[in-house]
């Protein structure tokens, strides 16, 4: 058996009884008491780990109140909808701080859609989404206005995450993308406008059939998830939830195009 080390002084600890199904430990050096859960995502939670994981997964598709009903009917546990919301919020912050290196292709698609955020000057705020041609989400950014500043912020964020500019950027007819692409990526990145109709372009020695239907299809999936919120209370909260769904889409959610997925057990 591998000995347990103290998280505070790194000395070998001794067993000190049990709490429910968890082994407790006590450090011989600093007398710190802790358990197997002390440094995990589930520290100081009284519900079992599977209940918390399932509630978080349910919340990716339905509201917290429906998640509460599903847990009660399937697993006979009755956490409050507020507890489920707090678990999901903690998971969102955990994903935001998770550093994972991903590789993206050289063809990117960008689009924006309106969402409701309390406090926005217009009737709506705007969610900017950048993906590559393999359906991997690179970034999701929420801004209060649909202008060049929002486009620059989204593309700058995507460039920082991917650590390289794309060769081709495809967008709809919004003129802000043209200036934002030149400002963020420079002249080496080719920008093309292609909405629902396919645009045929010869670049170098290759013929490209360019369309933005790929990201329009993703927007329909975002709508199904966003519908359960009915809007966000703050801009920071909107960015946090949208980034959480982006990580969920990239890492966990199965897609038509084959890609490597991981279980939520590998994250928390």
Q: Where on the chain are the PLM-derived regions?
A:
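Short, positively charged, Gly/Tyr-enriched micro-motifs
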Residues: 26-106, 112-121
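Residues immediately within or flanking Cys/His clusters that coordinate Zn2+
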Residues: 3, 24
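C-terminal domain-tail junction helix/linker
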Residues: 228, 232, 239-268
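Short amphipathic alpha-helical "interface-anchor" segments enriched in bulky aromatics
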Residues: 63, 207-246
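A short, conserved beta-strand element enriched in hydrophobic/aromatic residues
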Residues: 70, 125-147, 154
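Short, cysteine/histidine-rich loop/knuckle motifs that typically chelate Zn2+
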Residues: 7-8, 29, 221
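Active-site beta-loop-alpha junctions of metal-dependent nucleic acid enzymes
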Residues: 46-47, 90, 140-164
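Short Cys/His-rich "knuckle" micro-motifs
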Residues: 14-19, 37-40
